[in-house]
Amino acid sequence: LNPATTTAAQVIDAEGQLLTPPFVDAHFHMDATLSYGLPRINQSGTLLEGIALWGELKPQLTQEELIERAMTYCDWAVGRGLLAIRSHVDVCDSRLLAVEALLEVKHRVAPYLDLQLVAFPQDGVLRSPGAFDNLQRALAMGVDVVGGIPHFERTMADGASSIRLLCELAAAQGKLVDMH
């Protein structure tokens, strides 16, 4: 636009400071945020050990602690310029405790943070008994996006089948898809 052809409602002199659009975190796992050392430290530093530790921690989680840690993270994120986050939330626990907690967080932060939730079958939608039903329940509760982890299925064929299954579900419900 030519500055001479538009009139600003307000002019702010940033005095040489940098002004940018807000940051976006397009891939996060807010249900696991601030859980370092729980139930213990990942000694190998590998993803597989991290996933195993998460599996050990899930039965011990409470909704209150999930909400508290997620709210702390959201406050930190906004303070550093993040105003949109897409977070995966594990749906392999039939209690859907993390889903309930992050839906509550989404409601609380809605006035200042765009939090989009992905129903994520951490242990594989085909590999983990009940995961597909849990994923559908999470979507019915208000989760925004269908997630998947095809490389974590038992075989490449199962991985391909999981992609088809999840994409068909997303298409039927008019949802986006975000797979690892």
Please place each PLM-identified region on the residue numbering.
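Histidine/acidic residue-rich metal-binding segments in metalloenzymes
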Residues: 97-111, 127-180
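Di-metal (Zn2+ and/or Mg2+/Mn2+) metal-binding site signature of metallo-dependent hydrolases
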Residues: 17-39
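Divalent metal-binding segments
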Residues: 44-97, 151-157
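Short, acidic/polar
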Residues: 65-76, 126-138
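Active-site gating loops and adjacent loop-to-helix segments of metal-dependent hydrolytic enzymes
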Residues: 34-66, 142-145, 166-169, 173-175
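A cross-domain feature marking catalytic cores of carbohydrate-active enzymes
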Residues: 89, 117-122, 148-150, 179
